[in-house]
């Protein structure tokens, strides 16, 4: 094998969404790709019915799939969501559209189905995928890694370039931390989450809009529901693990000791949602309570030998629906740098320099978005700011672009979207202060401030 051939070998740990996408992109460009996954092949039916985990696919992720030639196949399995349907007790559900029309929507996609499409795509491009083999250790000096199966049998492999796409609890990240200081900073969240289910029959009985992301805001806690193709919905309850010290009586998972306690909680706090959850007691007891955290790293790579991407590099909370989209965007950027750079060390350094600021930005915006989803969506002040923002977007479409639109419907770098969003937020807050409706607001004066503070964007990529 020549030195050039050797330089185009890659070993990927983790056959989730980011790992399979980067495998397909590199294999299509002639790289020799070996992908290792500790779990069994999800495409092989075992008879066990897993949980239905849904993700929100936005333009960043859709663009990545488009480049990989898989967008059409994925969207055929997805459900369009035109906006947030906000449920507040005592008022009719209120649809808050995401964008101007059906060109600005997001898509609900089952994670398992998306993973299967990407696995097929990686194999079709020539990648070799090895299941039931988890990473145990990495010897960077010898460029060898050790894998093992469920029986404890160990296998040693040589690697030239190692990509860690193995999620929040990354074994590659752990191995890298033994040879370089990754600058890890973990920020745990007081909230956990629990996944529940609305059946197709229940969604039909209660006339639940199928083309929307549903939100039941409740301040310190909330429920969301994403649609499935069969008109069922995957519901997620976000709630504190423990009651805050200052509010010892506030609801938390620790108080919900079983399914019956969960039912009583839903009957009190989500009275319109509770009747839709036919299997609440069983779902609550059988589905684990998930943990949420944000992990920030200052270092993503070890020279030209190893690099992290997706959740392995930047775990984030799910409140902006961008974790998957950011990971798929990572995969595209990494493949492009590896294809164009003179050597792997240059490629990994350039990839890190490009993506780190954006990862930090979307991590911050995801944390901020919890407040918007759980509280602001039902606030009159927020709704007035949103209405004024829509008017400014119509008057100055190249200058005032709602932050949600920049994040969700464009590929403008997250860091730029965040910076512009902060300026826009301050403009709106100042403009609506002491006003209860638009009639008393000087729209021309607000527009003047928009043109003064926000340079035009010639195009949104």
Swiss-Prot record:
Optimum pH is 8.5. Pfam families: FAD_binding_3. This is Kynurenine 3-monooxygenase. One of its GO terms (biological process) is anthranilate metabolic process. One of its GO terms (molecular function) is FAD binding. It comes from Pseudomonas fluorescens. Transmembrane segments: none annotated. L-kynurenine binds at residues 84, 98, 369, 404. Pathway: Cofactor biosynthesis; NAD(+) biosynthesis; quinolinate from L-kynurenine: step 1/3; Siderophore biosynthesis; quinolobactin biosynthesis. Catalyzes the hydroxylation of L-kynurenine (L-Kyn) to form 3-hydroxy-L-kynurenine (L-3OHKyn). Probably required for the synthesis of quinolinic acid and the siderophore quinolobactin. Its EC number is 1.14.13.9.
